[in-house]
Amino acid sequence: MTSVRRGNSKQSVKTISVVMAFLLVSLSSFSQIGEHRNDLSIGINGGYILSNVGFTPKVPQNFHGGMTMGVSVKYVCEKYFTTICSLLGEINYASIGWKEDIKNAQEQPVINTATGVAEKYSRTINYIQMPLFAHLAWGKEERGMQFFVQAGPQFGLYLNESSDSNFDIEKINIDDRSNTIVKQYSMKVERKFDYGIAAGAGVEYSVPKVGHFLLEARYYYGLGNIYHDSKRDYFGKSNIGNIVMKMTYLFDILH
């Protein structure tokens, strides 16, 4: 089992490397045959994140909601026929985690015997997230609307975490739960560095001398785990997943 999990970790690193190499090769290919651009813009972004953690053994969950905000930098390097090619990087604060769906065998809320109310538990984990995207767009270059897609690696640095529950962990109603996995309640994040793949799509509206307004939806799949995953460890998998909806405002520095 240990060798399998180590193999998964190596495969994740290989996946990140392949994606980064593909992005660099793709942009390099465009640069050799496209129309050169040298446009740089910076700005701010903000939005809402729906997140969960993919546990093995499984922990039933609903989405955890949280905010994200940060700074964005976009460099437009080429136009290849109708495709506008850019690099987009961000440094964001993100509040993510998981929210448990605690039910009994009849799919009803589990009532805590000590408090008399339905048990609730969520964990919030705050990160600095740093995605780097190959950004491909089609539409108006100077004034008007563009549609874009983007994909690339994302890295995360752990800041802190907090739990929110309405019961004493020592007095859980474990007998009525359809899922009895509760080890996570006493475990803090063990791996402080997160990495994975992100991809998204959206629209951008540009107004000369005013700036660029972007609206997008994005998905992130973590290739690392928040807990150790050797044969001796409890969880074999504990990777983060995010659905992000955000707006970005950029203004030109070079054009």
Features from the language model and the residues they span:
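Bacterial Sec-dependent N-terminal signal peptides
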Residues: 1-37, 45, 247-255
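Short loop/turn motifs that connect adjacent beta-strands in outer-membrane beta-barrel proteins
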Residues: 32-39, 78-85, 139-146, 207-212, ...
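Short glycine/proline- and aromatic-enriched beta-strand/turn motifs that initiate or cap beta-hairpins
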Residues: 32-74, 252-255
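Predominantly the C-terminal beta-signal and adjacent terminal strand-loop region
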Residues: 37, 194, 199-255
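Residues on the lipid-exposed face of transmembrane beta-strands in outer-membrane beta-barrel proteins
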Residues: 44-48, 69-75, 93, 130-138, ...
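Extracellular/periplasm-exposed beta-strand and loop segments of Gram-negative cell-envelope proteins
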Residues: 53-63, 96-128, 158-194, 225-242
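Transmembrane beta-barrel architecture of outer-membrane proteins
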Residues: 64-70, 84-86, 125-131, 146-148, ...
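Acidic/histidine-enriched, beta-strand-rich ligand/metal-binding domains
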Residues: 85, 94-98, 124-126, 137-148, ...
